[in-house]
Regions:
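Family-specific signature for flavin-dependent thymidylate synthase
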Residues: 1-347
Length: 347
């Protein structure tokens, strides 16, 4: 089995802790926890609870799994003949629509790749049902690789542990990823004119010699007006700070570029909204009910992941000259960070 590509190690400045760069992510599983904690504004507790990911999975908050990604080229067992490649290709496509399946009949391989949520569906339901399609050693390596990337999402089955106590496959994979993690430098963060942070948390290497990739961003300090537009790009994956769980008292906001009189009216209105929200919370109104009055100008943070076609669509749509200025500025930064020159509206 050949791994199609490896996962880049992200390094991040935590906006809630300080401005100094810190190596927060040791393995891709850490990106999942970070995305989950963004929802609850609990990033200061990052990596303090070993079972955080298990809790997320147990309550089926599975969107955070979509921030992890893995891909493999698998050898199909030759005993099934040439037609087996097409058979397995169609079987996998029908059963696992959220995994991306590529057919490489000349190389006698099938490419399987997708986010950790798609892999988790396969892992939880019926890994054994595809066991016979591929070589036993390949399947063992696939399971061990996924486990090394996200051990709390893909725990190694007990039967495989006993079979591989002295097996070098897992050790080699672990050392390979550890070397890649140690070789990364710095983090990539840009600040918009309104003070929002655009952070590239991670990006895969090119997939099998193509221009395909998977990337994860965090947008911090953007308005809800921007995030409402962002989530329209449904092919991407999102984990957003929750107004249901995060208290909105004295919320910050983003002012649009309007005339001074309008700005003063906006500020006065937001001051009134803040007072009403605070009064409701003092009367023990739940956050999930009090949030009904929070405006689109309220600041939020969101983690966004996706493959190259999702990011390109976002770039093409949101860098257009008639795009809303706040999201256009973010999209232009994303385009530059990704080095994606295929967007139709370069600045």
């Amino acid at each position: 089995m050949e791994k199609i590509y490896t996962i880049t190690q992200p390094i991040l400045s935590d906006p809630l802790i300080g401005s100094n760069p810190r190596k927060l992510f040791h393995i891709p599983q850490d990106v999942l926890e970070w995305g989950g904690r963004i929802c609850y504004r609990s990033t200061p507790k990052f990596r303090t609870s070993p079972d955080f990911i298990q809790k997320i999975i147990s309550v089926e908050h599975l969107d955070v799994l979509e921030h992890g990604y893995a891909g493999f080229l698998m050898d199909v067992e030759e005993e099934y003949g040439v037609d087996s490649y097409y058979y397995f290709y169609h079987q996998m496509n029908q059963k696992y629509p959220y995994l991306r399946i590529d057919l490489h009949p000349t190389a006698k391989k099938i490419g399987i790749y997708g986010n950790f949520r798609a892999w988790h569906q396969l892992y939880e339901n019926d890994f054994t049902q595809i066991w016979g399609m591929f070589g036993r050693k390949d399947m063992q390596e696939l399971i061990l690789t996924l486990s090394n990337l996200a051990p709390n999402v893909f725990p190694v089955p007990s039967w495989l542990v006993s079979q591989n106590e002295n097996n070098s496959i897992g050790g080699e994979i672990r050392r390979e990823h550890a070397m890649q993690m140690a070789n990364q430098k710095g983090f990539n963060c840009r600040v918009t004119s309104s003070g929002a942070n655009v952070m590239l948390l991670g990006k895969t290497n090119a997939i099998n010699g193509t221009d395909r990739y998977h990337a994860t961003f965090q947008f911090n300090g953007i308005s809800r007006a921007l995030s409402h537009q962002l989530v329209r790009h449904r092919v991407l994956s999102f984990s957003q700070e929750s107004q249901r769980y995060v208290d909105g008292t004295n919320f910050q906001y983003v002012l649009p570029n309007v005339d001074n009189e309008s700005k003063q009216e906006i500020k006065s209105t937001i001051s009134f909204i803040n007072e009403v929200y605070r009064n409701m919370r003092n009367r023990k109104v739940k956050k999930e009910d009090a949030r009904c009055i929070l405006p689109n100008a309220a600041v939020t943070q969101i983690v966004v992941s996706g493959e190259e076609f999702g990011w390109r669509h976002f770039i093409e749509q949101r860098t257009a000259s008639d795009a809303q200025p706040e999201i256009r500025e973010v999209a232009l930064i994303v385009q530059d960070m990704l080095g994606d020159k295929n967007g139709s509206n370069l600045s």
